[in-house]
A protein has these predicted regions:
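N-terminal glycine-rich phosphate-binding loop and ensuing alpha1 helix
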Residues: 2-80, 106, 142-146
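Alpha-helix/helix-capping structural signal
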Residues: 14, 60, 135, 213-214, ...
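Conserved beta-strand scaffold positions in the cores of enzyme catalytic domains, especially
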Residues: 30, 101-103, 157-159, 246-248, ...
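Residues at the starts of beta-strands that form the adenosine-phosphate
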Residues: 7, 52-54, 100, 127, ...
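Catalytic-core segments of class I nucleotidyltransferases/pyrophosphorylases
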Residues: 129, 148, 152, 181-284
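Residue-level signal for inorganic ion chemistry
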Residues: 39, 65, 119, 134, ...
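Positively charged, low-complexity intrinsically disordered leader regions
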Residues: 2-8, 280-287
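Conserved beta-loop-beta/alpha segment of the NTase-like Rossmann-fold superfamily
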Residues: 75-78, 92-177, 219-222
């Protein structure tokens, strides 16, 4: 049986340029879907999967991210004094246990693989998860929990996967797999951002990984790949070449690309509609706006 996965890396060093000017002063990961930051969705998912140690790979200007996970005793005291117990519990749920969270700087933006490599000393020789907060996945059972349960049966490396339109393959790492509709599929190869004509399939890697320490050893070589960056996909592909098993996991859930404005807005609406106190007002507004927009077009 493989070792338990208790550590997760969160690469959050990006500049968030697609959300300027907001991200001039606010880290993208702190931007909220309804009333919870993007990064909180990732943390909650990780906790549900049994993660105990949280490693953030950051860059300059991410101080608000660290502050968010810090305790706020003055605010807690004020809420307690005013009897706002429900809000107090919401606030306390964002607190992290002492020693459970670490921050590592990525001094140069050299790619996702490089960001993961920056955390190597905190991972050691253990299997670990990588979670990209931009990918928010709404699921009855959290995506990483689904993967951990599958990983405990397979070992090796595992990546979350979903089918994308052929014209979208150039935006993703794409898996070369045998034709199969199973949730867990054996991966024969991986290609980073291929043109549709060169893509071995339309099964794309999404921002959830469970990886073995051998991937970190591959990243030690610091080979440049697509876009001149150190690609995590390439390091996983090296394991495949050495017959280390790699699996794609078709998760149950809906993925939102919150690195794009349209995906962020879609996620905001979807999560708001799940909230009983917001649903009716929002639906009433949508039912008013959508017909008028359609008529105008």
């Amino acid at each position: 049986m493989p070792r338990k996965v208790t550590k997760a890396i969160f690469p959050v060093a990006g500049l968030g340029t697609r959300f300027l000017p907001a991200t001039k002063s606010v880290p993208k990961e702190i931007m909220t879907l309804v009333d919870r930051p993007l990064v909180q969705y990732a943390i909650d998912e990780a906790r549900a999967a049994g993660i105990k140690e949280f490693i953030f790979v950051t860059s300059r200007g991410k101080g608000a991210l660290e502050d968010y996970f810090d305790h706020a005793p003055v605010l807690e005291q004020e809420l307690r004094k005013k009897g706002k117990d429900e809000l107090l519990e919401v606030l306390k749920s964002t607190n992290m246990d002492s020693g459970a969270i670490a921050y590592i700087r990525q001094h140069k933006a050299l790619g996702l693989g490089h960001a993961v490599w920056c955390a190597r000393r905190l991972i050691g020789d253990e299997p670990f998860a990588v979670m990209l907060p931009d990918d928010v996945i709404a699921a009855e059972k959290p995506c990483l929990q689904q993967m951990v349960e599958a990983y405990e049966e397979t070992g090796g490396n595992m990546v979350a996967a979903m089918e994308v339109a052929p014209e979208k393959t150039s935006s993703y790492g794409i898996l070369d797999v045998k034709d199969s509709n199973d949730a867990v599929v054996s991966v024969n190869g991986m290609v980073e951002k291929p043109k549709s004509a060169d893509a071995p399939s339309n099964l794309a890697v999404i921002g959830r990984y469970i990886l073995s320490p051998s991937v970190l050893n591959n990243l030690n070589k610091r080979k440049q790949g697509a876009g001149g960056e150190i690609q995590l996909t390439d390091a996983i592909a090296e394991d495949i070449a050495r017959d280390v098993p790699v699996y794609g996991y078709r998760f149950n859930g809906r993925r939102f690309d919150c690195g794009s404005k349209s995906g962020f807005l879609q996620a905001t609406v979807a999560f708001a509609l799940e909230r009983a106190e917001l649903r009716d007002d929002l639906m009433e507004y949508i039912s008013t706006v959508v017909p008028s927009r359609s008529a105008a077009e």
